[in-house]
Amino acid sequence: MLNNYNSLAQPMWQNGPAPGEFYNFTGGQTPVQQLPRELTTMGPYGTKHSTASSTTGTSVLGIRYDSGVMLAADTLVSYGSMARYQNIERVFKVNKNILLGGSGDFADIQSIKRNIDQKMIEDQCCDDNIEMKPKSLASWMTRVLYNRRSRMNPLYIDVVVGGVDNEGTPYLANVDLRGRSYEDYVVATGFARHLAVPLVREKKPKDRDFTAVEASELIRTCMEVLYYRDTRNISQYTVGVCSVNGCGVEGPFQVNENWTFAETIKGY
């Protein structure tokens, strides 16, 4: 019965650890782990995630009216506090149903815009005549931005998504760098949250939506106020309009400047 018994003690651990090392539970086979591209760029002292923005765009304002949406943003991209790039559009046409406006780090805006363009190409490759809707894009962006935030390497952007669905229903939403989102008849980023949103809410009729003419007038007034009050704004801006008739970006337009009221401002 004991003829085949090996009296020699077997090692307790196969592939056991060397002194000062850890046990290799994979038996010497180390799986290849593909890290996300933004986590693999090593510097001389390790990986450094960006913690601040260098080239930034300021406010984006979006207003929903009875048959569509309007988005507006100035054309300035600042380098720190310097008005470096003064002819850069920050309102984009995504497809015939969607407009996108971005503020924050402009490099991150370009990055997410390239990803969105790639998704539009994938939709076209399916050749099923089904295009992404604004609500779908906003939902997808919440997942992307929350995923980047959870990896402690966020995209420093604050975006406005607007458009119309197949039934012609307008949609307007805001998504921030943490993936938080909300819908409303007026959304804004940057200083426009404090300066423009109260102006729009004050003019909102109680029993109906804005008309296209009313929304256009509010856009003009709000961009004028932002130019006066926000040091990162300039007088030139573009307006994106999306309705059942299609989407497009119009402009650039100029603010009607009038600085005569400055004579009465005292104390600073």
From Swiss-Prot:
What InterPro entries does the annotation carry? Ntn_hydrolases_N, Proteasome_beta4, Proteasome_bsu_CS, Proteasome_sua/b, Proteasome_suB-type
Keyword Phosphoprotein listed? The answer is: no
List GO BP terms, alphabetically.
centrosome cycle; proteasome-mediated ubiquitin-dependent protein catabolic process
Q: Which UniProt keywords apply?
A: Cytoplasm, Nucleus, Proteasome
The organism's lineage is: Eukaryota, Metazoa, Ecdysozoa, Arthropoda, Hexapoda
One Pfam family per UniProt? Proteasome
The subcellular location is: Cytoplasm; Nucleus
Q: Which GO terms describe its cellular component?
A: cytosol; nucleoplasm; nucleus; proteasome complex; proteasome core complex; proteasome core complex, beta-subunit complex
What SUPFAM superfamilies is this protein classified in?
N-terminal nucleophile aminohydrolases (Ntn hydrolases) (SSF56235)
As for family, the record states: Belongs to the peptidase T1B family.
Query: Gene3D superfamilies annotated for this entry?
Result: Glutamine Phosphoribosylpyrophosphate, subunit 1, domain 1 (3.60.20.10)
Its biological purpose is as follows: Non-catalytic component of the proteasome, a multicatalytic proteinase complex which is characterized by its ability to cleave peptides with Arg, Phe, Tyr, Leu, and Glu adjacent to the leaving group at neutral or slightly basic pH. The proteasome has an ATP-dependent proteolytic activity.
Q: Which domain of life is it from?
A: Eukaryota
Primary location: cytoplasm
Kinase keyword on record? no
| Assembly and oligomerization | The 26S proteasome consists of a 20S proteasome core and two 19S regulatory subunits. The 20S proteasome core is composed of 28 subunits that are arranged in four stacked rings, resulting in a barrel-shaped structure. The two end rings are each formed by seven alpha subunits, and the two central rings are each formed by seven beta subunits. The catalytic chamber with the active sites is on the inside of the barrel.
Name of the protein described by the UniProt record: Proteasome subunit beta type-4
